[in-house]
Every structure is written in C-alpha cells, then in structure tokens.
C-alpha cells in the first residue's frame, strides 16, 4: 500500500519487528522513497540474533532504510554489531551518547553509539530515541473543557444505552488479543445480565 500511495520522494515510516522485511520490498519497488524504520522492541544481541534462520534477509531489508531507530543506544549497538558481523556493513564513527541515556547502575547503558552504517553504497543513519509521553501535558489536556466535551460526545455516540467494554493494546499475537476476546466471550456466557 505504501508503494502505491506514497508521493514521489515521500518518507515512509515502518514500525516494529513484524515488518522487518518490508523496507527491502519498498526499496525494490520504490527506490525514490525515503524509508525510516523504528524498532519498538529490544533488538537482540548478536548471540541471539545470529540464531534466526532469516537473519541475513532481515538485516539486508533494514539496511535498505535511510534511518533505523531504536529506543536506547544499547539496541542501536546490537543492530550495528549484527549488521557488521553478519552481512558486512561498515560502521560509521561512534558519537557520545546523550547524558539522559547514561545512568549509573543501568545495565543497558552505552557511553558511545554508532552514528551510521554504510552498506551497498547507502548510508543508513542510526537513531536512539525513546518514545515517551508528557504526563503533565496529558493531565492538563485530560481535564480541559474541549476534551471533556469530546468525551461526552464519544460516550453518547458509542454507548447509546449499552455498556461499553474497552481494551487498548497493540495488534500483535504476543499481546493476547485472541485470549482477551475469548475471556470476554466467557464473561458474557456466565453473566447474562451484561
């Protein structure tokens, strides 16, 4: 879909390990696109990643990106190490890690991090950037009149006199969505009043 819909030279963001192979397909189909990939889960160390039967295909695909990002420098280094040792990517210079990433006693601290990789004539920028929230802003917005009125509209539109049960989670087989639906089914079977 991204290949068919993206404008000439657009940036396509790909998210998480479920789509490891997507950048390679996108690059083959649309070499004009800028491809960014963000890995939302820990990228394993070489000793674990090297066991995967598709390790080379995964790395070659991710190395089709213009930018590959991870939450913390350790995961960035794990990826850089895998790419250099398993498929021969060339490592760019290491740069100092932002102090917010370095805490005494933190097992995942890195003092420096690889800035980029070179592979098949391409430069792949590496990014360490935790995805976080701004609790103060969320709290402020939560109680604002506009959000409260939107909330009321949602309640009126969705409930319509019914009970509403909501679950918010990632659509990933490891998150137990099927089990959640089965549990809900059992609840409805046992509690006819719901």
Residue ranges, per PLM feature:
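Catalytic cores of carbohydrate-active enzymes across secretory and cytosolic contexts
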Residues: 1-194
